[in-house]
């Protein structure tokens, strides 16, 4: 899988990625994270890979000190059992308070998959909103800790991020700017965690993305799965593969939102797009621009393929067979 999808990063207009640690087994040590980075660089050297650790009981304050010294960017938290390869995830955040305190001292980033497990009266539709008090509590206890609420899907999540101080931000994906409940209910290739919600929630995400507020920036959460695991069997895999056209899909979503009256065309300026897609995220992560690159987006005859294949695996991309924008790189 890695050999098939890593070359698609730059195809989607992206040159910097925060690499998720939810492999099997999860990436819980600095050595393993750096070994993973070397493998990625061997496939595509022209990408800046920001490596992370999986928040796990074996991660200690001493691990954080070592991680900072050796160039690890952050730690990713997955609630236990909520999404792909999260069985080793968090049940009780309080046990990690010493880790968070050290992350705050070391100025590392905590990336949150913001959902609670679907138990009792919690469903996939309410799991994100039920998590938001945890976000607020973590921010209150560790006000200098940089926290990212990843892949926001609700208006409530947008408001929670706004309520927090400047050390808290939220990412928004390309697919959540266009899909709603009905999309994934009828198409497994639109199913991901957290799931897309209502049209009102989608519109709140669009407005946040186009607001120019630096607390909101793009994060693809592109999650490739073998096509067979998306078509049925025991359980459909949660994840949407957007990377080969992820920048183009954001532009498509903005364009559609303008046609639907959710956004105004005059408000989607180059500065707004650059801020959401690049500048705000780079600033939050503290990434320099030693080799600044630009992408050129053009309305050519670009079509998203039906499937990506290798000798070992097939992956179906989001919006397969549909027309989109083309992307080229310029120094």
Pin down the residues of each PLM region:
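Short, electropositive alpha-helical surface patch
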Residues: 41, 49, 68, 123-143, ...
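His/Asp/Glu-enriched, well-ordered alpha-helical/loop segment
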Residues: 214-217, 223-288
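Catalytic metal-binding/acid-base residues of hydrolase active sites
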Residues: 23, 54, 115, 152-153, ...
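Structural signature of the urease/amidohydrolase superfamily beta/alpha-barrel
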Residues: 277-312
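Divalent metal-dependent hydrolysis catalytic cores, especially in the metallo-beta-lactamase
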Residues: 5-29, 41-56, 72-85, 107-118, ...
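Di-metal (Zn2+ and/or Mg2+/Mn2+) metal-binding site signature of metallo-dependent hydrolases
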Residues: 1-8, 281
């Amino acid at each position: 899988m890695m050999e098939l999808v890593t070359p698609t990063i730059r195809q989607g207009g992206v040159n910097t990625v925060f690499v998720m640690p939810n492999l099997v087994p999860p990436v819980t040590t600095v050595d393993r994270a750096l070994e993973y980075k070397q493998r990625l660089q061997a496939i595509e050297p022209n990408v800046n890979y920001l490596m992370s650790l999986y928040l796990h009981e074996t991660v200690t304050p001493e691990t954080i000190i070592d991680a900072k010294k050796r160039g690890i960017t952050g730690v990713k938290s997955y609630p236990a059992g909520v999404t792909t390869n999260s069985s080793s995830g968090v049940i009780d955040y309080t046990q990690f308070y010493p880790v968070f305190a050290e992350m705050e001292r070391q100025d590392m980033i905590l990336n949150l998959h913001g959902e609670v497990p679907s138990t009792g009266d919690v469903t996939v539709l309410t799991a994100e909103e039920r998590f938001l008090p945890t976000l607020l509590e973590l921010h209150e206890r560790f006000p200098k800790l940089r926290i990212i609420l990843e892949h926001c899907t609700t208006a409530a999540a947008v408001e929670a991020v706004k309520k927090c101080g400047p050390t808290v931000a939220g990412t928004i994906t390309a697919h959540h700017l266009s899909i709603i409940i009905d999309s994934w209910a009828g198409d497994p290739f639109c199913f991901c965690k957290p799931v897309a919600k209502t049209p009102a929630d989608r519109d709140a995400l669009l407005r946040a993305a186009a607001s120019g507020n630096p607390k909101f920036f793009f994060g693809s959460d592109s999650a490739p799965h073998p096509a067979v695991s998306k078509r049925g069997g025991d359980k459909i895999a949660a994840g949407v593969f957007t990377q080969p056209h992820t920048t183009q899909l954001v532009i498509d979503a903005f364009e559609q939102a303008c046609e639907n009256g959710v956004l105004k065309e005059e408000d989607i300026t180059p500065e707004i797009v650059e801020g959401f897609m690049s500048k705000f995220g780079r600033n939050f992560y503290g990434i320099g621009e030693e080799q600044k690159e630009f992408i050129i987006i053009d309305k050519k005859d670009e079509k998203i393929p039906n499937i990506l294949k290798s000798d070992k695996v097939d992956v179906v991309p989001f919006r397969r067979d549909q027309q989109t924008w083309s992307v080229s790189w310029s120094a």
